[in-house]
Amino acid sequence: DAHDLTNIMPWSTEESIKASLRERLNNTKVFIILIGEKTKFHHKFVRWEIEQAIKKGLPIIAVNLNGKRYHDDDLCPSILDTELAVHVSFNQKIISKALSEWESLHNQYKREGKTGPFRYNQDAYTALEL
C-alpha cells in the first residue's frame, strides 16, 4: 500500500504533501481513485494527484462509492472525462478483477490509441455474481 510509505500530517506544507504524494505515485503500478460525493470538488490535491498519474501513464481505476458501474458525470472529476480509465462500482470482486486485468488492458488500449472512460459490461458483473 503506497499510502503506508510516508505520513502526511495536518501541519504539512503543500510542497511536502505533494512530495509525499509524488513518492507514493513513484511506487505504484495502478492508480485507484475513490469517487464520492465531493471528489469532483477537491481540486487542490485530488486533481493534482490525478494529473500526476496521467503524466506517469499509470493505469487508472475509478471506483464509484455510490455503486454506479460506469463513468459518473455528476461526481467524477472532469479531468477524467476523456482519459483512459476503467470505472467500476465499490465492490471487492470487481475491484480485484480490475486490479488483475486493467494494467494490461490499459497498455493495449494505449498502443491502439484508445482514450476515454471504459467500464465492465453486465456479463462481467454477472460472472462475479454481482
Task: For each feature predicted by the language model, list its residue ranges.
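C-terminal interaction surface of TIR/SEFIR-family domains
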Residues: 69-130
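Conserved BB-loop
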Residues: 1-21, 36-43
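Conserved beta-strand-loop-alpha-helix hinge of the TIR/SEFIR fold
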Residues: 24-52, 58-69
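A broadly tuned preference for mixed-charge, low-complexity surface segments
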Residues: 17-31, 80-89
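Active-site donor-binding loop signature of nucleotide-sugar glycosyltransferases
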Residues: 2, 65, 90
